[in-house]
Every structure is written in structure tokens, then in C-alpha cells.
Amino acid sequence: MTKTYKYEDQLDFIQKSDDVKNLFIIKKGFVPNMNVEGHLFANDNLSKLLFDELKQFTDDPGSFLPALKQLANVAALPGIVKSSIALPDAHSGYGFSIGNVAAFDMDNCNSIVSPGGVGFDINCGVRLLRTNLLYKDIEPIKEQLVQKLFDLIPVGVGCQGKIPCDYGDLDNILEYGMDWSVCSGYSWAEDKEHCEDFGRMIQADPTVVSYRAKKRGLSQIGTLGAGNHYGEVQVVEEIYDEYSAKVMGIDRIGQVCIMTHSGSRGLGHQVASDALVDMENSLNKSKIKVNDKQLACARINSDEGKKYLKGMAAASNYAWVNRSVMTHLTRKAFEEVLKESADDLDMHVVYDVSHNIAKIEDHIVDGKLKRLLLHRKGSTRAFPPYHPLISADFQHIGQPVLVGGTMGTCSYVLTGTQLAMDLTLGSTCHGSGRTLSRNKSRRILDYNEVLNNLKEKGISIRVASPKLVTEEAPESYKDVSEVVQTCHDSGISKKCVKLRPVAVIKG
């Protein structure tokens, strides 16, 4: 029988590191069968939120386990190496916490892949465009501009895309990713140079994606969706690293940028759902023991594991095309309102990052080079300068890291570091992280008050479902500036640019 510890006893398994700033170590024994430690990166304030969640947990049916429990349960999965890592924006999710990083040894025949370690919105990510405009150039036409963006980019639950696409096109999207969008005229050739994996995972196989998933995805290309997804017109508020910012084409306070946050829409959700059914059915056959049934998984080299990775890669390619088409529509909106070409406005992609994805990467573990399957769920790749997988333009500064804020709060551009490779498997935060559930946000917040607060900050907003904006109110989230500063202080990413929203479209 598994021993159940009281909260005070559980704290005996958690200690603060003396060597690394903002690191809490969850020792083996916190939950059964841990193969490695859990490592939580958080300052005292952010860690208190997670400790309070653990203390107040009542094991209600249907509720997620506390994030610290989830972090430790992942540490018990077969083949995991180094540690199960939680970043400062970590909060409870399906199986894995959101903000969890976990790596599995590709040379270990028992190593697993888990859809819960990627999430339902496969390759949910963020893209940032820069312009040569200053805020004073758009301030008089800001309302017109945000309305044009809202008119051109479909938003909301179940929204339909405006790009003609048949199943043949969809298969090409799933296989070729941004290569398709370049050939089809929805991306500039240079765009993919500033995307992770250059906007295409080559192991993608459209044939493993179910008809139901394809049917859901067919009409949603170039759509924003709902939830925490958004399109924002932003202005540069602070520049912390002038050299790195200039390499990215950001060199002035007040410079106008555009950030788009979306993923693989219904197609990715269905790919994840289909894989979970396959893996739940195979768990008994494979005799894999998990502490939580939401951690359904399969061995990487099993039929189920290979199928999921091929389908996940296809959904990732879909997400890159989705953001590419919205980039095309964003450029079109600026052209129509400002009466200048996107090229003349210098509307170049700064970078495109993935927040929910699994990738095969090489890392040093215990002094040895190992090929690992990296699960990043609600976290961002943060490779250092001179890493071979970084675009040539950024070799001297490290990978740009895009950290989106909540509705009405600032966003950040960071850069990756060598210390991230050493401590977090080349990973850092992705956003702010929820503190209130969506249901609780709807219960206690008034949507009119939320909208009025945005207007008082000078933020123009267009939203498809006004009553749902309470779910994304700043009060529902941790402070993104505190999250970013915690990562900066720990050395796993460096602050580069701070961006302030001036116009927002949401579902």
C-alpha cells in the first residue's frame, strides 16, 4: 500500500538549493517510484503559490493534481534523465504540469513518450513581427487598425478560416509545414529562417493523422481560436540588451511590433486525444507503471510511440502554417490601413517559438553526450549562442525567446544561455502561468470591469466573446515580469526587450 504523507511531512522532501538561485529540489520519495529528482525554478513568492496549492489539495474527483505532485510523478516515468523540471510559470495541467520539461534517453529501450508532456494544443507558440513604425505613427489610426485585424483574422471558438484548402492541400501542410506556406504565397522565404526547426518537422507523416483530426483542421487554417490565444499590436517599452535587440531588428523605444499566439487548433487537439486512447489501451500490454493515469504513455520505439511522434510532428507543421497565414493576414491589414507595402514597413519575423512540443535533441547528461526526447509543455527552448540548431542570424546572441504576457500586461523577448543547457535542458519559461481556474475567473471577475481596465490603459480591444475575457484577465495569472525576472536571476535566460500592448484581438 502506498504511504500517504501529510503536508508537513511532504515538505521534508523539498529543499532549497544552496548553489543555484531560485532552485527548489524535490527529493526522491516525495511520490513513489521516482527515478530522478524534481527541480522547481521559482522565487519565494512564486514557490509559495505552489506550496499553498499542495497544502490545500483535497483530491476532488476531476481536479488536476497539484503541480508539485505532477512534477514528481513525471520523475517516476521510465527512462527519464537529469530531473523533472518545472519553470517559474508552472501550474497544474493534464498529466504533466504546464511549465514542465522532461527528457527521456533515446538509447534506453524503456524510455517513453507521453502526449500529456506536450499538451492538447500541439505546437502552441508565439510569433513576433517587427516594423519600422513608431507608436506615434499608428496612434491616430489604432482603432481602425485593430478593427481591420479583427475583420481579417478569424477568432473565437470554432471559427472558420478564409484560406481555400482541400484535403490534398492539408496533407501537404501536415508534411511540409512552412515550406508549403512559402510555396503558396503565405510566407516570405526568409520567414522560416527565424522559426524553430525552420517551420517544419521532417518526421511528420500525414497518413497517421485521423480523418476526424483532418476534418477539424481543414477549415481552421489561419485562425486564432479562443482561450489564451491572441493577436497583439505592441510597442517597445524597454531595451535591456541593446546589442541583441539590434540583431533582432529592434532598436528604438516605441517601435511597433505584432505578437501572435496560437497553435494547431482542433487538429492538434484531436491528434492528442487519439494518441491518449491508443496509449491508455496499450499501457497494460506494455506493463508500464505510472503514478497517474493522465500520464498515459508508450515506449518511444513502440508502434504507438512512433505513431504519436509522427502525428505530433504533422500537427506541429500545421501550427506553423496557421501562424504563417495569420502573419500574411496581419501584413495585409497593415498594408490596407497604412497604404504601404509590408516590405516597405519592414514587417519581418523576429522569431517563432514553440511552447508545447517534443523534440529529439543532444544534451550533456552526467558528463556524457546523450540523444534525448525532450518534452516541453508550457516552456520555451532557450539555446545559447553558437548552438548548431539556432538560425545563423542569431548565432552570436543565442536563441530569441518569446514570453507572452496576459491580456493587458507586458510581454518579453529573452535570449537563451549556456546555463539553461546545464540546468534546464536548454529551456525557460513561456508566459505567466495561471493562478485562478477559468471557472473561478468567470465567477469572481466582471467582464465589463476587465474591459474598462484595458481601455483605461489605452489598449484597444476587439473580442468575439466578451464574457470570456474574465478567463484571461491579469488577475487570473501570475505576474509575468516576476516570472521573467526569476528566470533571468537564475541564469536560464537573459532579458532583452519588454513590449507593451496597445491593441488586442481575442476570441
UniProtKB/Swiss-Prot annotation:
Q: Which SUPFAM superfamilies match?
A: Hypothetical protein PH1602
Matching InterPro entries: RtcB, RtcB-like_sf, RtcB_euk
Q: Where does GMP bind?
A: 228-232, 355-356, 404-407, 411, 430-433, 506
Protein keywords: GTP-binding, Ligase, Manganese, Metal-binding, Nucleotide-binding, tRNA processing
Instruction: List cellular component terms (GO).
Output: nucleus; tRNA-splicing ligase complex
Please give the catalytic activity noted in the UniProt record. a 3'-end 3'-phospho-ribonucleotide-RNA + a 5'-end dephospho-ribonucleoside-RNA + GTP = a ribonucleotidyl-ribonucleotide-RNA + GMP + diphosphate; a 3'-end 2',3'-cyclophospho-ribonucleotide-RNA + a 5'-end dephospho-ribonucleoside-RNA + GTP + H2O = a ribonucleotidyl-ribonucleotide-RNA + GMP + diphosphate + H(+)
Q: Which domain of life is it from?
A: Eukaryota
Coiled coil ranges (UniProt) are: none
Q: Which GO terms describe its molecular function?
A: GTP binding; metal ion binding; RNA ligase (ATP) activity; RNA ligase (GTP) activity
- Write out the residues that bind Mn(2+) 2: 124, 261, 355
Question: What is one process in the GO biological process aspect for this record?
Answer: tRNA splicing, via endonucleolytic cleavage and ligation
What positions constitute the catalytic site? 430 (gmp-histidine intermediate)
Cofactors, names only: Mn(2+)
What PROSITE patterns does the entry give?
Answer: UPF0027
Which EC numbers characterise this protein's activity in its record? 6.5.1.8
From which residue to which does the signal peptide run? none
The enzyme's main class, written as a single word, is: ligase
Where do the annotations place Mn(2+) 1 binding? 121, 124, 229
A Pfam family of this chain: RtcB
Q: What is the recorded function of this protein according to its Swiss-Prot or TrEMBL entry?
A: Catalytic subunit of the tRNA-splicing ligase complex that acts by directly joining spliced tRNA halves to mature-sized tRNAs by incorporating the precursor-derived splice junction phosphate into the mature tRNA as a canonical 3',5'-phosphodiester. May act as an RNA ligase with broad substrate specificity, and may function toward other RNAs.
Q: Which family does it belong to?
A: Belongs to the RtcB family.
Q: Any remaining note in the record?
A: Ligation probably proceeds through 3 nucleotidyl transfer steps, with 2',3'-cyclic phosphate termini being hydrolyzed to 3'-P termini in a step that precedes 3'-P activation with GMP. In the first nucleotidyl transfer step, RTCB reacts with GTP to form a covalent RTCB-histidine-GMP intermediate with release of PPi; in the second step, the GMP moiety is transferred to the RNA 3'-P; in the third step, the 5'-OH from the opposite RNA strand attacks the activated 3'-P to form a 3',5'-phosphodiester bond and release GMP.
Q: What is this protein called?
A: RNA-splicing ligase RtcB homolog
